Amino acid sequence: MTEVEETLKRIQSHKGVIGTMVVNAEGIPIRTTLDNSTTVQYAGLLHQLTMKAKSTVRDIDPQNDLTFLRIRSKKHEIMVAPDKEYLLIVIQNPCE
């Protein structure tokens, strides 16, 4: 098992985690624990939102960069960890 697979398995085992996915720089999912339609929807929308958030952070301070994005709604909490080539996305129940 690769280090990436071990990390994803460890994250997925946390209480309340609904799903995890890794998305490439173009917004295409390359690893997921969710069904296909949910994965495609989340990957596309969160990729756009993350790119906009990165751009906003840089517009405010060109020396700065987005390191983590957390979105909490009534139903879910979505955490995005952007890297140069990938996004790690974790969806969990907010009450846990």
UniProtKB/Swiss-Prot annotation:
Annotated GO CC locations: cytoplasm; cytoplasmic dynein complex; microtubule
Keyword Ribonucleoprotein found: no
InterPro entries, alphabetized: DYNLRB1/2 (IPR016561), Roadblock/LAMTOR2_dom (IPR004942)
Compartments (UniProt record): Cytoplasm, Cytoskeleton
SMART domains: Robl_LC7
Keywords, in A-Z order: Cytoplasm, Cytoskeleton, Dynein, Microtubule, Motor protein, Transport
GO biological process: microtubule-based movement
Statement: the UniProt record of this protein carries the keyword Transport: yes
Pfam families: Robl_LC7
Subunit structure: Homodimer. The cytoplasmic dynein 1 complex consists of two catalytic heavy chains (HCs) and a number of non-catalytic subunits presented by intermediate chains (ICs), light intermediate chains (LICs) and light chains (LCs); the composition seems to vary in respect to the IC, LIC and LC composition. The heavy chain homodimer serves as a scaffold for the probable homodimeric assembly of the respective non-catalytic subunits. The ICs and LICs bind directly to the HC dimer and the LCs assemble on the IC dimer. Interacts with DYNC1I1 and DYNC1I2. Self-associates. Interacts with DYNLRB1.
Protein family per UniProt: Belongs to the GAMAD family.
Role, per record: Acts as one of several non-catalytic accessory components of the cytoplasmic dynein 1 complex that are thought to be involved in linking dynein to cargos and to adapter proteins that regulate dynein function. Cytoplasmic dynein 1 acts as a motor for the intracellular retrograde motility of vesicles and organelles along microtubules.
Protein name, as recorded: Dynein light chain roadblock-type 2
Organism: Mus musculus (Mouse)
